[in-house]
Structure formats: structure tokens, C-alpha cells
């Protein structure tokens, strides 16, 4: 009894250092949270002010210092935007361009990524390096050649001028390649033995396993095409072919700007982007953490 009591009494104080060590390990996380909370608030404030100002009048928005909270709920900006006869057409144009771009990048990007990941052909590495090099070329250097090509094809001032340059991007091909390199080959080899073609293997076996990559490419492509303003501003002249981003610029005149309408239109424009990210958030983050590690 005495010996066991002594052992028990001697072992009891050993738990205290472990607790102190755990607290020391948790302190940095708390410090990070305290640091990230104000930063998150700073990033969220512009979006919050955008929503609040969409319910203000033009006088409230133009006031200095600017109002942080509307005196009353005013739907004048939304009535102005939704009452514009061209607004449904602009919204439909943006949906068409974004949908076609997302679909083509998923299909063509997966085909290109699978070819670079699984097929070895002469010049594949050089072609991959050339494709990746195009990712660092700024748009300002390619917009004039792209415009001339679209003019030669007769697509200027049509939605085709917005769709064709975004049919497939090097980033989509690269992301699919990196993800496919991380998948095991055993299932593909078994399908080949059963007589499946490469296309059947890609779309029936590999593609279902690549849902994170598919979601990531879909979200990023949708964001790029939906929010694009610079290229439609160059390629589109007639208001019937305007996208939503380009149409919102018509609310800004030389001498007067309908700021309430601009804010309301931006809120409507942001909603599809937020919904797309919220629905694909889990698979989007999973793809970012799992791809890019293979070379």
C-alpha cells in the first residue's frame, strides 16, 4: 500500500507540464485568430457597404463623409436596374458566355490534362513548357492580336468574340494534369484490359474521381468570364451584345452617375458568384490542397 501510494503521489505532478505545454501550443492559434479576425472584417467591409449602399439614395451615397448606414430602405436603385429594358438581355448574355466557357474548359481542359499526364509523345514536354509560358503573358500584350483574329473570323460585336478566346485556358489544362498525376493507374489499366478506349476511361473512370479539379476549374472559369470587363469593352460595340459588367457602365454618365443603380446592379452581379463558390466550396478547397504537388 505504501509503495503504491508513493508511486501514485509521485506520478500525479507529471500531468501539469503537459497541460502547460498544451496551453503554449494553443496560444499561437489564438493569436492568429486575433490577427485574422480584423483582416477578415476589412475584406468583408466593402461587400457589406456595397449591399447597404444599394438601399441608399444618390444623395446619401454622394454625401461627404459617406453614410455607413441608410436612413431608410430605398429600392430606387433596384427599380432603376430591373426596369431597364436591356438588363435581362445583358444578364442572359453573361450567362451564355460563362456557361459555354465553363463547359468547354471542363471538356477540353480534361482532354488536354489527361493527354499530358498519361500519354508520352514527341515534344510533349516542350509543348507543356510552351503552354505554361503563355500563362505569364499579360492580357495587354495579347488583346490586339486576339482582336485581329476575331475580326478576321468575323466575330467582332458578337458573343462569339467573347466565347472563342475562353474556350480553353492553359490553367485548366495544367490543373487537370496535376490532379491526374496524383490518381493511381491501376483502375485505368484494368479498364484498358477490358477493352475500354482512352476516352471511355477518361469520362467513365477518371472524371468521376476528379470532381475537386472539375469544381475548381468550373468556379475559376466562371469567375473570370462573369467578371470580365476589359475584353468585352474592346470586342463589343452594340448594346444588345453587352454583358452584365459592360451594361452596368451605361449607368455612369459624363455629368451624372446613378450610384444607387450602380450599387444595386453590382449586388445582383455578385450574387451568382457567391452562390457558385458556396456550392463548390468544399471541393474547391480540396482540389487546391491536393493538386500541384506532382511534377
Task: Annotate each predicted stretch with a short phrase.
Residues 1-20:
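Short, intrinsically disordered terminal tails adjacent to the first/last structured region
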Residues 29-295:
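A structural signal for multi-pass alpha-helical bundles of membrane permease subunits
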Residues 18-33:
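A detector for short, charged/polar N-terminal pre-domain segments
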Amino acid at each position: 500500500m505504501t509503495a503504491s501510494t508513493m508511486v501514485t503521489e509521485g506520478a500525479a505532478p507529471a500531468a501539469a507540464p503537459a497541460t502547460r505545454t498544451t496551453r503554449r501550443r494553443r496560444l499561437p492559434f489564438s493569436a492568429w485568430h486575433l490577427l485574422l479576425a480584423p483582416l477578415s472584417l476589412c475584406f468583408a467591409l466593402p461587400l457589406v457597404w456595397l449591399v447597404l449602399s444599394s438601399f441608399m439614395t444618390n444623395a446619401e451615397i454622394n454625401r461627404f463623409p459617406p453614410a455607413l448606414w441608410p436612413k431608410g430602405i430605398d429600392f430606387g436603385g433596384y427599380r432603376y436596374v430591373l426596369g431597364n429594358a436591356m438588363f435581362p438581355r445583358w444578364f442572359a448574355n453573361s450567362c451564355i458566355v460563362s456557361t459555354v466557357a465553363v463547359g468547354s474548359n471542363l471538356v477540353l481542359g480534361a482532354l488536354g490534362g489527361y493527354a499530358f499526364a498519361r500519354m508520352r509523345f514527341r515534344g510533349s514536354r516542350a509543348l507543356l513548357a510552351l503552354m505554361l509560358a503563355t500563362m505569364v503573358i499579360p492580357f495587354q500584350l495579347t488583346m490586339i492580336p486576339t482582336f485581329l483574329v476575331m475580326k478576321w473570323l468575323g466575330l467582332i460585336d458578337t458573343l462569339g468574340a467573347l466565347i472563342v478566346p475562353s474556350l480553353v485556358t492553359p490553367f485548366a489544362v495544367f490543373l487537370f494534369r496535376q490532379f491526374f498525376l496524383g490518381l493511381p493507374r491501376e483502375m485505368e489499366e484494368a479498364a484498358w484490359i477490358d477493352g475500354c478506349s482512352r476516352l471511355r476511361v477518361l469520362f467513365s473512370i477518371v472524371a468521376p474521381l476528379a470532381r475537386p479539379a472539375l469544381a475548381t476549374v468550373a468556379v475559376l472559369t466562371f469567375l473570370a468570364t462573369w467578371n470580365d470587363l476589359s475584353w468585352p469593352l474592346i470586342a463589343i460595340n452594340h448594346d444588345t451584345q453587352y454583358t452584365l459588367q459592360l451594361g452596368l457602365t451605361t449607368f455612369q454618365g459624363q455629368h451624372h452617375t446613378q450610384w444607387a443603380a450602380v450599387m444595386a446592379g453590382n449586388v445582383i452581379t455578385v450574387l451568382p458568384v457567391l452562390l457558385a463558390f458556396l456550392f463548390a466550396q468544399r471541393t474547391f478547397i480540396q482540389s487546391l490542397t491536393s493538386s500541384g504537388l506532382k511534377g
